[in-house]
């Protein structure tokens, strides 16, 4: 009985599931596995399916491993490295002489600075600064050299109109600056008053009702800046 079972098992393993019936020759009794018949196609299909699944798992594992290696390499190449640019070359320290300690003539000779004489133009007339004075362009060192007493009356009438013209231009410029400063002061005072009113309206709860009543006069006078006498007194 045991021999027949072993023979039947060996036959099943060798043929991948195809069983063969064998009888016991020693006892002559019929084997209990004679009438058992197993289908021939089920075991090969199961084995083939198992082999296919194992192959697919191996293929998927290899592809996943390859993809994971690529991701890790991409991360190492682009994200894991610190930003370390190359250092620039060191500057060569050059020794410079202290030109600012030199006087004007030596510095001008060393650096080649030659700006020329200052020039300006007032009322369609050009002037040159020579010898500490503004003289009309074209006249040379006549004003620099001392003149005799006989030529002083003839020289004074020429310098007087020029000096008066320069002073007049300077006076007009100062007046213009004064007007500009007054306009800026007026605008600043008006803005300060508006800010004070806004702060008072935020602190006082009854202020919105009064500000609503003032909307109509403000709309009528839009574009016109009304300056109160207090702003002028502050100036």
UniProtKB/Swiss-Prot annotation:
Name of a matching Pfam family: Chibby
Tissue specificity of this protein: Testis-specific.
Top-level taxonomic group: Eukaryota
One of the GO biological process terms: spermatogenesis
Subcellular location: Cell projection, Cilium, Flagellum
Region of interest: Leucine-zipper: 167-181
Record's keyword terms, sorted: Cell projection, Cilium, Differentiation, Flagellum, Spermatogenesis
GO CC annotation terms, alphabetical: sperm annulus
Region (Disordered): 1-41
Annotated knockout phenotype: Male mice exhibit severe fertility defects, caused by kinked sperm flagella with the annulus mispositioned in the principal piece of the sperm.
Biased composition (Low complexity): 14-32
Keyword Ribonucleoprotein attributed: no
Assembly, per entry: Homodimer. Interacts with CIBAR1 (via BAR-like domain); both proteins form a ninefold symmetric structure at the flagellar base; are recruited to the annulus in a mutually dependent manner and regulate annulus positionning.
Additional note from the record: 'Chibby' is Japanese for 'small'; the gene was so named for the RNAi phenotype seen in flies.
Biological role: Plays a key role in the correct positioning of the annulus, a septin-based ring strucure in the sperm flagellum, serving both as a physical barrier and a membrane diffusion barrier that separates the midpiece (MP) from the principal piece (PP). This positioning is essential for proper sperm motility and function. Interacts with CIBAR1 to form a complex which localizes to the curved membrane region of the flagellar pocket. By doing so, may provide stability and rigidity to the periannular membrane to prevent membrane deformation.
Family: Belongs to the chibby family.
Name of this chain's protein: Sperm annulus positionning complex subunit Chibby3
């Amino acid at each position: 009985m045991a021999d027949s079972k072993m023979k039947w098992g060996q036959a099943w393993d060798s043929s991948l599931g195809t069983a063969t019936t064998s009888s016991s020759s020693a006892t002559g009794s019929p084997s209990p596995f004679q009438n058992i018949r197993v289908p021939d196609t089920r075991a090969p299909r199961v084995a083939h399916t198992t082999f296919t699944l194992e192959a697919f798992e191996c293929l998927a594992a290899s592809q996943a491993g390859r993809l994971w290696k690529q991701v890790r390499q991409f991360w190492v190449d682009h994200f894991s490295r610190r930003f370390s640019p190359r250092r620039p070359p060191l500057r060569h320290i050059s020794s410079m002489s202290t030109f600012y300690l030199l006087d004007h003539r030596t510095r001008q000779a060393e650096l080649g600075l030659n700006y020329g004489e200052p020039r300006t133009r007032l009322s369609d007339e050009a002037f040159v600064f020579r010898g500490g004075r503004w003289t009309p362009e074209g006249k040379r060192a006549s004003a620099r050299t001392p003149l005799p007493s006989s030529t002083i009356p003839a020289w004074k009438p020429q310098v007087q109109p020029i000096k008066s013209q320069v002073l007049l231009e300077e006076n007009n410029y100062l007046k213009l600056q004064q007007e500009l400063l007054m306009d800026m002061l007026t605008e600043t005072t008006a803005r300060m008053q508006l800010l004070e009113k806004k702060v008072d309206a935020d602190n006082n709860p009854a202020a919105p009702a009064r500000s609503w009543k003032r909307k109509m006069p403000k709309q009528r006078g839009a574009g016109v800046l009304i300056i109160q006498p207090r702003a002028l007194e502050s100036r």
